[in-house]
Swiss-Prot record:
Presence of keyword Cell inner membrane: yes
Alphabetized HAMAP family for the sequence: UPF0283
Coiled coil location: none
Domain of life: Bacteria
Subcellular location: Cell inner membrane
Organism: Shewanella oneidensis (strain ATCC 700550 / JCM 31522 / CIP 106686 / LMG 19005 / NCIMB 14063 / MR-1)
Family: Belongs to the UPF0283 family.
Region (Disordered): 1-22
Name the UniProt record assigns to this protein: UPF0283 membrane protein SO_1811
Cell inner membrane in keyword set: yes
Transmembrane segments: 99-119, 129-149, 239-259
Broad class of where this protein is predominantly found: membrane
């Protein structure tokens, strides 16, 4: 019995072992399959997330880049024009240039020959006449030489502003030390002593790099110069607006604008240490006109929109007041362009003066001017002033008699 029971007792154990081995194999295979499936699922899930992120952000990326490029182009366009407009034109025709040089040399040679022949004839006729002619020619020649040298220096000083602006833009990004001192000294020697210069001298330290020194110079000195130039521009713009509103003739309007703008450009340039001569003034006016014509799109739309809206609203009240407002805004625009061309460091976008603040002051000036002319109180005040002037004049005449 025991012999027969042994096989029956070992067979269940063998079957149980086989079952446990097969179960373990199935569990292992299932685990491997589960691991492989999990890895593939993770890869698929990551790829799906990348596709979703690409779908979400890919369409917006080129739009943002295009907007940045457009903004940078609009911001950089007027500055590039400001620099290039001051520089002498190098693309002029050589044929006209050589003809101009030959013509000038021929005229100078002809003048010299005629002068020598005239002096020789005067010497043969009378030594006293020769002395008189020689003295007159010496005085006129000395005056002409001094004037030419002065005009050349003033024109050269104006043309150097473009190079100074390029150097300032480069030093504003420089982490080196030593070059900014000479750059600042070369500029401030043309400026009068002021509180900004004193604060700059106390603020500059040896451990400051070039970018920090240029930033201090712009914040302490140039900001002070900018405020003074803005006051000059606003004053001349207000005077031009009132004079144009009171002027009855178009020819007189043109003379007033030309006269006031010439004085304004001279005073604005003097704020930045630039003395204008005849040719340098013509060069500056030419550069201003070029910058106004080829101004950036955003700046042009803002300024013209402000000007046209203000002139249209004022024109409904009075055509003469609208004419004065337009002339005042034109004067202010010329003054602001002169500031940009004469400033040794280029304006930043947030620092560039706008016409939106000037037209409010012009409207207030014209409103006060119109009120003095149209209201009864204004007429009574004017009548009182005239009567007082007549009384003072008559009393002076009686005292003299």
């Amino acid at each position: 019995m025991s012999v027969e029971l042994l096989p029956h007792s070992t067979e269940p154990h063998a079957n149980g072992a086989d079952k446990s081995v097969s179960a373990a194999a199935r569990v292992t295979q299932s685990l491997k399959k589960q691991q492989v499936f999990d890895a593939e699922q993770v890869k698929l899930q990551s790829a799906t997330d990348e596709l979703k992120s690409a779908q979400m952000f890919a369409p917006q990326t080129p739009i943002t880049a295009i907007d940045d490029v457009v903004d940078e182009a609009l911001a950089a366009h007027p500055q590039a024009l400001d620099v290039e407009s001051i520089r002498p034109k190098l693309h002029q025709s050589r044929r006209w240039s050589w003809l101009a040089r030959l013509s000038l040399m021929a005229l100078l040679l002809l003048t010299l020959v005629q002068t020598v022949l005239g002096l020789r004839d005067a010497w043969l006729e009378s030594p006293w006449l020769f002395s008189f002619y020689g003295a007159v020619l010496g005085i006129v020649g000395s005056w002409a030489i001094v004037g030419v040298i002065g005009e050349y220096r003033k024109l050269k000083r104006l043309k150097q502003v473009a190079d100074t602006q390029e150097t300032g833009a480069r030093l504003a990004l420089s982490m080196q030390m030593g070059e900014a001192d000479g750059f600042i000294d070369n500029i401030v020697r043309h400026y009068p002593d002021s509180q900004g210069l004193q604060r700059l001298r106390h603020s500059l330290k040896d451990e400051h790099n070039d970018a920090e020194k240029v930033l201090l110079f712009e914040d302490l000195v140039l900001t002070e110069r900018d405020e003074l130039a803005k006051k000059i521009v606003r004053r001349y713009a207000a005077e031009s607006a009132v004079l144009l509103a009171a002027s009855p003739l178009a020819v007189l309007d043109m003379a007033i604008i030309l006269w006031r703008n010439q004085r304004m450009l001279r005073d604005v340039a003097a704020c930045y240490g630039i003395e204008l001569g005849y040719w340098s003034r013509i060069k500056l006016i030419r550069s201003i006109v070029i910058n106004i014509i080829y101004a950036g799109t955003s700046e042009l739309v803002t300024d013209l929109g402000t000007q046209l809206l203000s002139v249209e609203m004022t024109g409904k009240l009075s055509a003469r007041l609208a004419q004065g407002l337009g002339g005042g805004l034109l004067t202010a625009r010329l003054g602001y362009q002169a500031m940009a061309l004469c400033r040794p460091i280029r304006f930043k976008d947030e620092q560039r003066p706008k016409l939106t603040k000037v037209h409010q002051e012009l409207l207030m000036e014209l409103k006060q001017f119109a009120g003095n002319l149209l209201t009864k109180d204004g007429r009574d005040a004017l009548k009182t002033q005239l009567e007082g002037t007549e009384v003072n004049t008559s009393s002076k005449e009686k005292s003299l008699s």
